């Protein structure tokens, strides 16, 4: 007589038991069996499995949306950029067609000479350099004007160009007691080049016995004393520097 409520069959676990590998089965076949055993059941709560290509597709979609937004925002700026590039090309074409390199250089030299003459006239009309002594017109240079002119004068008054260059490259007066290279610190390359040209020009003129200075006596009202004014290329080059 059988007892009620007792199941004669043994209870089976809901967890799939690992399948035994048959003799002679290949590793690929075993991998397929494991995949079928793991993926055969349903996910709880009505969840569904995500396909492997879903995440890359979402990334591609977001990337396309960002590109569309960026293009929409940058379209006006791209138009301006293209317009400026086209205008720049047209200007270069006009310059190459109308102004060759020699013509451009000639115009630049002519404008530089006019600017130099303007400065000379301006300083003469404003401060009367021709009626000032050397010390007085040097004192009219203010701040950086006097600083740069002092280095220029150091080079041209040195016994030789190399000695003057060494003096400004090992300067102790500007930031005493430190020794600094003023050529590198204050970018004195224009002053060095002009001083070299000045010394070369003066040397050539002295070699041929040509005068480079014009001197005259200036009589001033007392208590100012009479002095000898000197006009030379040093003063003219000073205007170019300041």
UniProtKB/Swiss-Prot annotation:
<dbReference type="GO" id="GO:0016020">
    <property type="term" value="C:membrane"/>
</dbReference>
<keyword id="KW-0328">Glycosyltransferase</keyword>
<dbReference type="Pfam" id="PF10034">
    <property type="entry name" value="Dpy19"/>
</dbReference>
<keyword id="KW-1133">Transmembrane helix</keyword>
<feature type="transmembrane region" description="Helical">
    <location>
        <begin position="190"/>
        <end position="210"/>
    </location>
</feature>
<keyword id="KW-0808">Transferase</keyword>
<feature type="transmembrane region" description="Helical">
    <location>
        <begin position="149"/>
        <end position="169"/>
    </location>
</feature>
<protein>
    <recommendedName>
        <fullName>Putative C-mannosyltransferase DPY19L2P1</fullName>
        <ecNumber>2.4.1.-</ecNumber>
    </recommendedName>
</protein>
<comment type="function">
    <text>Probable C-mannosyltransferase that mediates C-mannosylation of tryptophan residues on target proteins.</text>
</comment>
<dbReference type="InterPro" id="IPR018732">
    <property type="entry name" value="Dpy-19/Dpy-19-like"/>
</dbReference>
<keyword id="KW-0812">Transmembrane</keyword>
<keyword id="KW-0472">Membrane</keyword>
<comment type="similarity">
    <text>Belongs to the dpy-19 family.</text>
</comment>
<dbReference type="GO" id="GO:0016757">
    <property type="term" value="F:glycosyltransferase activity"/>
</dbReference>
<feature type="region of interest" description="Disordered">
    <location>
        <begin position="1"/>
        <end position="56"/>
    </location>
</feature>
<feature type="transmembrane region" description="Helical">
    <location>
        <begin position="103"/>
        <end position="123"/>
    </location>
</feature>
């Amino acid at each position: 007589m059988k007892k009620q409520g007792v199941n004669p069959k043994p209870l089976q676990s809901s967890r799939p038991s690992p399948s035994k590998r048959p003799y002679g089965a290949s590793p690929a076949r075993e991998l397929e069996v494991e995949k079928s055993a793991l993926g055969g059941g349903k996910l709880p709560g009505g969840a569904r499995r995500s396909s492997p290509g879903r995440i890359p597709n979402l990334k591609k979609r977001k990337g396309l949306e960002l590109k569309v937004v960026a293009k929409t925002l940058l379209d006006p700026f791209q138009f301006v950029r293209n317009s400026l590039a086209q205008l720049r090309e047209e200007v270069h074409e006009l310059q190459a067609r109308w102004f060759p390199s020699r013509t451009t250089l000639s115009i630049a030299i002519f404008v530089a000479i006019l600017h130099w003459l303007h400065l000379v006239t301006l300083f003469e009309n404003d401060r009367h350099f021709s009626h000032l002594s050397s010390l007085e017109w040097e004192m009219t240079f203010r701040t950086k004007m006097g600083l740069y002119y002092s280095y220029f004068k150091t080079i041209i008054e040195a016994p030789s160009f190399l000695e003057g260059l060494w003096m400004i490259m090992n300067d102790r007066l500007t930031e005493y007691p430190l020794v600094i290279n003023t050529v590198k610190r204050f970018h004195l390359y224009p002053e060095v080049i002009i001083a070299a040209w000045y010394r070369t020009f003066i040397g050539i003129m002295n070699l041929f016995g040509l005068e480079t200075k014009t001197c005259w006596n200036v009589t001033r009202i007392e208590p100012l004393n009479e002095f000898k004014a000197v006009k030379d290329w040093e003063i003219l080059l000073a205007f170019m520097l300041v």
